Amino acid sequence: MSEKTAVLLLQMGGPDSLDAVEPFLVNLFSDRDIIRIGPAFLQPFIARLIAKKRATPVERKYEEIGGKSPIRELTEAQAKALEEVLGDGYCCFTAMRYWKPTTVEALAAIRREGITRIIALSLYPHYSRATTGSSVNELKRVLAQSGATFDVTYVDRFFDHPRYIEALAEKIKEGLDDFHPLAEVQILFSAHSLPQSFIDEGDPYLSHIEETVRLVMERFEGVTYHLAFQSRAGPVKWLEPSTEEILEYLAAHQVKNLLMVPLSFVSDHIETLHEIDIEYAMLAHRLGYAKFRRSPSLNTSPLFIDCLADLVRKAGM
């Protein structure tokens, strides 16, 4: 058996081709941790119907950003950078909740290396049962079914880690540098939305998001900022305000320069590359903004990788 520790990065994943869009959506809508559609025994059937209906418009969006999600390559780049920072004694792997490499495939790869100790590190900074909770539940299911004996430590949040906050602030400064020095720029944090019912039932996601924003904005004294939520879908009540609503509100109040900061995302994927860079950018143009920009995503930011390394080292103590 190897004395090394496996670091397993948990991420949602994304389709790696246009043909993968529909099966990816089936996997997503089949997950009862994220959405409950009817009785459990019917959900896989209903998920297939929803995925079939939504596949074509979603495929068009992926076609506009290169025909696939970049999230696998970016997560693997994060894993490689993290392994280099951690040095000997660690091997990094990735597990995607709704696509490949699956949790089953990741554990098989760890097992082939003869590693028995795992630090499962969620790449969702803000805990929610719909994101980290789902990935952890899937990992526990696969572990139970495998019959393998692993010593697993879970890192399920890092919304207030100093280096994560510093990494976000660095990217915001890069975004602000794209504006004229004398321009009055406001900041709009845009986080992935969540049904309000999750928060009402005690999910800490919203409080984690708000604390991240507070800590980041301590570094930008005097700058006006807002928080909104994107990517909502379906008829249930979602977190408010929506990003579209805030864009319209700010335009109506004569805001002309806006920097959008993707929050709750640590790498580029469809929500940044299409929803923000294309859809919201077009809306901002129609609403009359003089300049609308997005701060760069964390991806392999050295500060962010240092944050992950610190989380791993502390989990391994």
Curated annotation (Swiss-Prot):
One GO term (biological process): heme biosynthetic process
Pfam families cross-referenced by the UniProt entry: Ferrochelatase (PF00762)
EC number: 4.98.1.1
Pathway per the UniProt entry: Porphyrin-containing compound metabolism; protoheme biosynthesis; protoheme from protoporphyrin-IX: step 1/1
Domain of life, source organism: Bacteria
InterPro entries to which the protein is assigned, alphabetical: Ferrochelatase, Ferrochelatase_AS, Ferrochelatase_C, Ferrochelatase_N
Binding site for Fe cation: 192, 271
GO molecular function: ferrochelatase activity; metal ion binding
Keywords, ordered alphabetically: Cytoplasm, Heme biosynthesis, Iron, Lyase, Metal-binding, Porphyrin biosynthesis
Compartment(s) where it occurs, according to its Swiss-Prot or TrEMBL record: Cytoplasm
tRNA processing recorded as keyword: no
Top-level EC class as recorded in UniProt: lyase
Keyword Metal-binding: yes
Main location: cytoplasm
Catalytic activity entry: heme b + 2 H(+) = protoporphyrin IX + Fe(2+)
A Gene Ontology term for the protein's cellular component: cytoplasm
Record-linked HAMAP family: Ferrochelatase
Annotated function: Catalyzes the ferrous insertion into protoporphyrin IX.
Classification via NCBIfam families: hemH (TIGR00109)
PANTHER family: FERROCHELATASE, FERROCHELATASE, MITOCHONDRIAL
Family under the similarity heading: Belongs to the ferrochelatase family.
Protein's UniProt name: Ferrochelatase
